[in-house]
C-alpha cells in the first residue's frame, strides 16, 4: 500500500519492530494471541465491521466535500438563537486551527493549564460584565440545556416548590428542552403570557420564571415590575439574554434578575447547523454554590503568585455524584475561549459598535418596510422585526427565498427577520425590494435607537485590561501565543489520562470544520438546503450503529453526560409507554464514573449501589440480590465496559441476563469504547442502549474541556424513544437546542471512520490494549497494577497503585502527578475510580518512544520516593513535595533546597533537548475556595490584593 494514503499507520503509534518488542516483553508472538487472552470469547464479534474500506486522507476529504456541496448556502436571517457571525482570522488561524488549543484536556491540573484558564476567566468576566451579575461559569452545552439547568437550580434553591413558569415568547427549542428535563423530575411547567400570568396565584409552589430578552419575536420588554411580583412569592427570576444585544440594551442584573443564561454564538462562532457553541450562565452571589458546570477562580501558588484554577469542585459530579448540581462534565471550553478572544479583540468599543450597527441596520429595514405598508408589530427591537402579514407569511418567506434569503415563518400570519453582523446595506435593499417592492439606497439610514430610552444600557462593560490591550493583530497574535505556551496539550506530550482516551486528533479530520459547507448553515433552514450535511450525519449515524451493534443512533446529545441522560430518558419513556412508568430504580456499581449517578438523578431515578469484589469486578451475588430485591421497580443498570478498573469482566453477559430477567434495561456507559471497536460491541454483549464519546473513541479533540458529542445507540425497541426535535416533526425527548446537536464537528468523526476503515478501527483497539499492557508490565513491579483480568492482563488502561509508597514516604498521589509535570507529562487520572491511585490510558496513538519516556519518568519518580523512604532525601523538602518546579524557581538567585536545581528541572537527560515549563508552582486549592474570585481585572491587580 502507498504509505502516503495509509492513514491508519499515521494514526497508530507503534509499528513493525516496536510492536514485536512490546509483544515480546509480554510473552506473546502475535497481537491476535494477546487479544484472545484478554477479550472474553463469548462477546467477540463473529464478523468484521461492515464498513467501507479505508480511504486516503485526500480521498476522504474529497468525498466529504462532494457530499457537503449538496448544501445550499443562502444568507440566513431566521434568528431564533442562531446568527451569522464573522470569526476574526487571527482567532481562526491561531486558536481554532491550533492543536495547542484544541487537543488539551479539562484543566484539572492548573499548573500546566494557565493559558486556557486565563481565557476562561476572561470568558466569565465578559459574561458577568455584560449580564450585570457577579458570578459566571465557564460554559454550558447550549442555550436550551442552560435553561433546563436554570430550572433545576431554581428548584434546588426552593426544594418545596414544584412549578416553573416559562414565557411563551422564549425560543421554542428552549421550551422543548425544558419540558424534557421536567418530565421525570416532577416539575410542573407552565408556558404562558407574562402579561397575564399572576405569580401570586402559584405562591410558594413557584420555583422560578424564565423570560427571553429580547424575546424570540424581537420585542424588548421591561421586566422590572413582573420580576418584583415574582420575587414577592420567593421565587427566582431567570433571563435568557442575547449577549450581543446586551452591548447596547440594559443588562438583566439591572432589573432584578437572579440567573441569566444564553449563548455566546454571536461572538464569532459559526452557526454550524446547530453547534457547537458555548452557552453561559451567570447568577447572584447567593446562588453561586448551586451553579452547574465549571467555575474558574483565582488562587495563589507556592510562591504566593496569582494562579487560576477550577473552583468549588465539590458541587460537581465527580465528587458529589447523584447529589451534584448537574451531570455536566465536558462543556464547551474551546468555544468559550473563542468567544472570549472575540471580546478581547474587539473590546468594549468594538462590541458596542457591532451591536449598534446591527440595530441601526434593522431600524433602516423597519423604516423602508413600514413606509411600503408592511405592518411591524414590535416597536422596541434590537435586531428582529415581526412582520404582520395576515395569511401571507408563507408568501413572504418564499419571496425572501427567491431573493436569496432565509427568514423565519412564525405562523400563517407572521414572519420575522433577524439581522446580524454579516448583514449589509445591500442585503437590506434586496430584502426591501423582495418583500415590499420598495426601492431604497444601498446606504443604510442610521440614526438613533428604535427602542424606548428606558432600555438603553447605561453601564460600561468589559473595562478590564484584557479587553483593552490586544486590538491590533500583532498584539493579539502574541497574546494567543503566550497563553498557548502555558498549557500542555497533545502537541507537546502524551496525556495518559485513564477513561479519557486522549488519542491523536489528526489534521485531516479537523480541516472540514472550517468549511462554510459544514459550519455556515442555520439549524432551521429548509430541508432542501441542508441535504449535504444531513447526508453526512446519516452516514455517520449508520456507521456508528454498525460499530455498536444497535438499530439506530441519535447524534443530538452534546456531550457524554448528555448522552447518558438521553439514554436513560429513552429507557424511561419506553417503560412509561409500556405501562411501567413506576420503574425508577437504577443499579450503579460503586466504581462508576460520577456522571452515572448524576445523570440518573436528572432522569428521576433512585440510585442503588452495587458492590465490587476484591478483584475490582462487579459483585455478581450482590447484583443478583439487588436486582431481585428491586425487580418490581427496576428500571436499569448503568455499567461501563470494559470496567472503570480497566478489565474485561467475564460475567458481563450474565449481568445483562440478570437485569433483563428482573424487568430492567441495560445502559452501557461508552467511556471505554476504545477497547471495544472491532472486537466486540454493546449489542453483542446484550446492552439496550449505550452512549459514545466522539471526543474519546472517535478522534474528536477534547478542546480543553469541550466541545464533545455524546450520541446514543439503542436496540430496536428503544428507537421510537430517541430524542425528538421541533424540526423533526416531534419534539418529545429533546435534549439539545438543535436536532443534530453539534452537527458541524461530527465531520471530524466522519473523517476518522472513513480514513481508518474496518481494519484500521480494529487495529486501533488492539494497539490501545497492547500499549496499556506494555506500560502495566514495565511499571507493575514498581507500582502494583491494582486490577487485572484472569491472565494478569488489562484492557486499554491500567490502575497503578502507589498508596503504600506514598504512605511510607509521607506523600500523596498529587505529589506524583505534580512531579510528572517536571518530566513534561500531564498526570494520569487520580481519585477515580480508586482514590490515591493513578489510572493510565496511553491510547493507540502514542509511539513506543513516548511510552518509554513515560516509563522512565515513573521509574525515576519511584526512585525519588524510595530515597525519601530510606532517608537519603528529606521527608519535607524534596523534589516531589515542591513540584512542579517553574523556570522562575530554578533560576532564582537563592536556592535553599537539599537537592540540586538540575534534579528539580532536568531529572532525565532527554529534557535537556526540550523542556516544557509549568507556568506556575503548585496551586493552593484551599486558598482559592476560601477567597473566591471568579472575575478579575488582571493577574497584576490580584497580585497587589494578595500583597495587601
Where do the protein language model's features map onto the residues?
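TRNA-binding/sensing appendages of the translation machinery
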Residues: 28-42, 257-262, 687-690
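Non-catalytic terminal extensions of PLP-dependent enzymes
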Residues: 1-25, 36-77, 86-102, 108-111, ...
Amino acid at each position: 500500500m502507498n504509505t502516503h494514503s495509509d492513514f491508519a499507520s499515521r494514526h497508530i503509534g507503534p509499528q513493525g519492530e516496536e510492536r514485536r518488542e512490546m509483544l515480546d516483553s509480554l510473552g506473546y508472538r502475535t497481537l491476535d494471541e494477546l487479544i484472545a487472552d484478554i477479550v472474553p470469547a463469548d462477546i467477540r464479534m463473529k464478523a468484521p465491521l461492515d464498513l467501507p474500506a479505508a480511504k486516503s486522507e485526500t480521498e476522504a476529504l474529497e468525498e466529504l466535500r462532494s457530499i457537503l456541496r449538496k448544501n445550499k448556502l443562502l444568507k440566513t436571517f431566521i434568528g431564533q438563537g442562531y446568527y451569522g457571525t464573522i470569526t476574526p482570522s487571527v482567532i481562526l488561524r491561531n486558536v481554532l486551527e491550533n492543536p495547542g488549543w484544541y487537543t488539551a484536556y479539562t484543566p484539572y491540573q492548573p499548573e500546566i493549564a494557565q493559558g486556557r484558564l486565563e481565557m476562561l476567566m476572561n470568558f466569565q468576566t465578559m459574561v458577568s460584565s455584560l449580564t450585570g451579575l457577579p458570578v459566571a461559569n465557564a460554559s454550558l452545552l447550549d442555550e436550551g440545556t442552560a435553561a433546563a439547568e436554570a430550572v433545576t437550580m431554581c428548584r434546588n434553591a426552593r426544594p418545596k416548590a414544584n412549578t416553573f413558569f416559562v414565557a411563551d415568547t422564549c425560543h421554542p427549542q428552549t421550551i422543548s428542552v425544558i419540558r424534557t428535563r421536567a418530565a421525570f423530575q416532577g416539575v410542573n411547567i407552565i408556558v404562558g403570557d407574562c402579561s397575564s400570568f399572576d405569580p401570586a396565584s402559584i405562591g410558594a409552589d413557584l420555583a422560578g420564571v424564565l423570560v427571553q430578552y429580547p424575546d424570540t419575536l424581537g420585542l424588548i420588554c421591561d421586566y422590572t415590575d413582573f420580576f418584583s411580583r415574582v420575587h414577592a412569592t420567593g421565587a427566582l427570576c431567570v433571563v435568557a439574554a442575547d449577549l450581543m444585544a446586551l452591548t447596547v440594551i440594559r443588562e438583566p442584573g439591572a432589573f432584578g434578575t437572579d440567573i441569566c443564561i444564553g449563548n455566546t454564538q454571536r461572538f464569532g462562532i459559526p452557526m454550524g447547523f446547530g453547534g457547537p457553541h458555548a452557552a453561559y450562565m451567570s447568577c447572584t452571589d447567593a446562588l453561586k454554590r448551586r451553579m452547574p458546570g465549571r467555575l474558574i477562580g483565582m488562587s495563589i501558588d507556592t510562591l504566593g503568585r496569582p494562579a487560576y484554577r477550577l473552583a468549588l469542585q465539590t458541587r460537581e459530579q465527580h465528587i458529589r455524584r447523584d447529589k451534584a448540581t448537574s451531570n455536566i462534565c465536558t462543556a464547551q471550553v474551546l468555544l468559550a475561549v473563542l468567544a472570549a478572544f472575540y471580546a478581547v479583540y474587539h473590546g468594549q468599543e468594538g462590541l458596542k459598535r457591532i451591536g449598534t450597527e446591527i440595530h441601526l441596520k434593522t431600524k433602516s429595514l423597519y423604516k423602508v418596510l413600514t413606509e411600503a405598508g408592511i405592518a411591524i408589530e414590535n416597536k422596541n427591537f434590537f435586531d428582529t422585526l415581526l412582520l404582520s402579514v395576515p395569511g401571507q407569511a408563507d408568501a413572504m418567506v418564499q419571496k425572501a427565498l427567491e431573493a436569496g434569503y432565509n427568514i423565519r415563518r412564525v405562523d400563517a400570519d407572521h414572519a420575522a427577520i433577524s439581522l446580524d453582523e454579516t448583514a449589509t446595506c445591500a442585503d437590506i435593499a434586496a430584502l426591501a425590494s423582495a418583500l415590499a417592492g420598495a426601492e431604497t439606497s444601498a446606504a443604510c439610514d442610521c440614526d438613533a435607537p428604535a427602542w424606548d430610552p428606558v432600555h438603553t444600557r447605561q453601564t460600561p462593560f468589559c473595562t478590564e485590561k484584557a479587553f483593552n490591550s490586544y486590538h491590533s493583530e500583532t498584539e493579539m497574535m502574541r497574546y494567543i501565543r503566550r497563553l498557548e505556551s502555558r498549557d500542555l496539550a497533545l502537541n507537546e506530550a502524551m496525556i495518559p489520562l485513564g477513561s479519557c482516551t486522549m488519542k491523536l486528533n489528526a489534521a485531516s479530520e479537523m480541516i472540514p470544520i472550517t468549511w462554510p459547507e459544514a459550519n455556515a448553515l442555520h439549524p432551521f433552514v429548509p430541508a432542501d438546503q441542508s441535504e449535504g450535511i444531513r447526508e453526512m450525519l446519516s452516514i455517520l449515524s449508520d456507521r456508528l450503529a454498525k460499530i455498536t451493534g444497535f438499530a439506530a443512533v441519535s447524534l443530538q446529545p452534546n456531550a457524554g453526560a448528555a448522552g447518558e441522560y438521553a439514554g436513560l430518558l429513552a429507557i424511561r419513556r419506553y417503560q412509561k409507554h409500556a405501562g411501567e412508568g413506576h420503574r425508577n430504580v437504577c443499579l450503579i456499581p460503586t466504581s462508576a464514573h460520577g456522571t452515572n449517578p448524576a445523570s440518573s438523578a436528572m432522569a428521576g431515578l433512585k440510585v442503588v449501589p452495587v458492590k465490587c469484589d476484591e478483584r475490582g469486578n462487579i459483585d455478581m451475588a450482590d447484583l443478583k440480590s439487588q436486582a431481585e430485591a428491586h425487580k418490581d421497580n427496576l428500571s436499569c443498570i448503568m455499567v461501563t465496559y470494559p470496567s472503570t478498573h480497566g478489565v474485561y469482566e467475564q460475567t458481563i453477559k450474565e449481568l445483562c441476563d440478570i437485569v433483563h430477567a428482573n424487568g430492567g434495561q441495560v445502559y452501557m456507559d461508552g467511556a471505554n469504547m476504545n477497547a471495544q471497536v472491532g472486537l466486540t460491541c454493546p449489542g453483542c454483549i446484550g446492552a439496550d442502549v449505550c452512549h459514545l464519546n466522539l471526543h474519546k473513541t472517535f478522534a474528536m479533540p477534547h478542546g480543553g474541556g469541550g466541545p464533545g458529542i455524546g450520541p446514543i445507540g439503542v436496540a430496536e425497541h428503544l428507537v421510537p424513544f430517541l430524542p425528538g426535535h421541533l424540526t423533526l416533526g416531534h419534539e418529545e425527548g429533546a435534549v439539545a437546542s438543535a436536532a443534530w446537536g453539534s452537527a458541524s464537528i461530527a465531520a471530524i468523526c466522519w473523517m476518522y471512520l472513513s480514513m481508518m476503515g474496518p481494519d484500521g478501527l480494529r487495529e486501533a483497539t488492539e494497539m490501545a490494549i497492547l500499549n496499556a499492557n506494555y506500560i502495566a508490565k514495565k511499571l507493575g513491579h514498581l507500582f502494583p497494577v491494582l486490577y487485572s483480568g484472569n491472565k494478569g492482563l488489562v484492557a486499554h488502561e491500567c490502575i497503578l497503585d502507589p498508596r503504600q509508597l506514598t504512605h511510607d514516604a509521607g506523600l500523596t498521589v498529587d505529589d506524583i502527578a505534580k512531579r510528572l509535570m517536571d518530566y513534561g507529562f500531564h498526570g494520569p487520572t487520580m481519585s477515580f475510580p480508586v482514590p490515591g491511585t493513578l489510572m493510565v490510558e496511553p491510547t493507540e496513538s502514542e509511539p513506543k518512544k513516548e511510552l518509554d519516556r513515560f516509563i522512565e519518568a515513573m521509574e525515576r519518580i519511584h526512585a525519588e520516593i524510595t530515597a525519601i523512604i530510606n532517608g537519603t532525601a528529606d521527608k519535607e523538602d524534596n523534589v516531589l513535595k515542591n513540584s512542579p518546579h517553574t523556570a522562575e524557581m530554578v533560576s532564582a538567585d537563592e536556592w535553599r533546597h537539599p537537592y540540586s536545581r538540575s534534579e528539580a528541572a532536568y531529572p532525565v537527560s532527554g529534557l535537556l533537548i526540550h523542556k516544557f515549563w509549568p507556568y506556575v508552582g503548585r496551586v493552593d486549592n484551599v486558598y482559592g475556595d476560601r477567597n473566591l474570585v471568579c472575575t478579575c481585572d488582571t493577574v497584576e491587580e490580584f497580585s497587589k490584593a494578595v500583597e495587601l
